[in-house]
């Protein structure tokens, strides 16, 4: 269950003094092909696990892609949580590799749709977060998140989640930090902003590093590559340390996995 204690009353918790290997899985996503994307994610998760990853982050909507024609189409790709196939896939992978995994998907609850990040671990489903700041056509198809910004206690530390545009607002990071999160896992689809001067392609890495520094917290952001109608994705996945510096990345515009060994107890120093 999420921890939502006031800042002044955080109880003592288990501290992991050993580094946790964090992996951001940067992959292409085939639009509207869930079977292919799950198979591909499985291969990437296996690779990350073979390199000792204990916490893995997948991109935003990693099973479906992002651009749709209308709400009816979005609804046809939505799943329930935790019963749906995508969540159960992540549960299976977490148990198989004794790892924690974060990934974003389209969630259905009744007639409402959400952009939802899932956290699974070695013991199964842990919790979910629903995107607060909807972007582009999402505002016509999905509901803003209604779960707040939970922080989940795990054996490796306190984990929080954000999704894409959430990471462009400093308040979201601050809410994670005030609840004593050790690491924020961001599933995102950073798109190429043509107005930025070279060599910059997106504001994502800069904002990630700035908010890691200002909140003395680890931030791991996994984005994607490839293109969809009207959008192209330049990569740039990054893991930032408590001093704001990049521990890994920004990643190039190719399928890859970046790794960083993060001593999550550094957030308490």
Predicted regions and their residues:
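N-terminal active-site segment of His-dependent metallophosphoesterases
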Residues: 2-55, 185
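Active-site catalytic loop in hydrolytic enzyme cores
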Residues: 3-9, 79-82, 108-207
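Cys-nucleophile CN-hydrolase/nitrilase-fold catalytic domain and related Cys-dependent amidase chemistry
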Residues: 34, 43-126, 190-217
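Short beta->alpha transition motifs characteristic of CBS
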Residues: 64, 71, 118, 129-135, ...
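CN hydrolase (nitrilase-like) catalytic-core segments centered on the catalytic cysteine
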Residues: 82-100, 168-257
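Short beta-strand scaffold segments in enzyme catalytic cores
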Residues: 103-105, 116-119, 150, 237-239, ...
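A short, polar/charged loop-to-alpha-helix boundary motif
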Residues: 131-144, 254-269
């Amino acid at each position: 269950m999420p921890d939502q204690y006031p800042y002044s009353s955080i109880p003592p918790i288990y501290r992991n003094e050993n580094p946790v290997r964090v992996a951001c899985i940067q992959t292409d996503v085939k639009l509207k092909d869930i079977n292919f994307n799950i198979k591909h994610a499985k291969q990437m998760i296996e690779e990350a696990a073979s390199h000792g990853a204990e916490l893995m982050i997948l991109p935003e909507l990693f099973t479906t892609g992002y651009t749709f024609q209308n709400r009816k189409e979005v609804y046809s790709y939505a799943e329930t949580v935790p019963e749906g196939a995508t969540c159960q896939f992540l549960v299976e992978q977490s148990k198989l590799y004794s790892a924690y995994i974060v990934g974003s998907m389209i969630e259905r609850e009744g007639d409402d749709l959400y952009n939802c990040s899932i956290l699974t671990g070695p013991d199964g489903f842990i919790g979910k977060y629903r995107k607060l700041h909807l972007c582009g056509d999402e505002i016509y198809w999905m509901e803003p998140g209604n779960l707040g910004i939970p922080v989940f206690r795990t054996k490796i530390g306190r984990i929080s989640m954000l999704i894409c545009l959430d990471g462009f607002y400093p308040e979201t990071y601050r809410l994670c930090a005030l609840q004593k999160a050790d690491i924020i896992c961001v599933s995102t689809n950073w798109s190429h902003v043509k107005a930025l001067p070279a060599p910059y392609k997106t504001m994502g890495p800069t904002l990630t590093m700035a908010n890691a520094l200002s909140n003395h917290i680890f931030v791991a952001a996994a984005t994607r590559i490839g293109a969809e109608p009207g959008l192209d994705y330049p990569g740039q996945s990054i893991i930032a340390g408590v001093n704001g510096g990049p521990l890994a990345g920004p990643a190039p515009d190719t399928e890859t996995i970046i790794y960083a060994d993060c001593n999550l107890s550094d957030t308490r120093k």
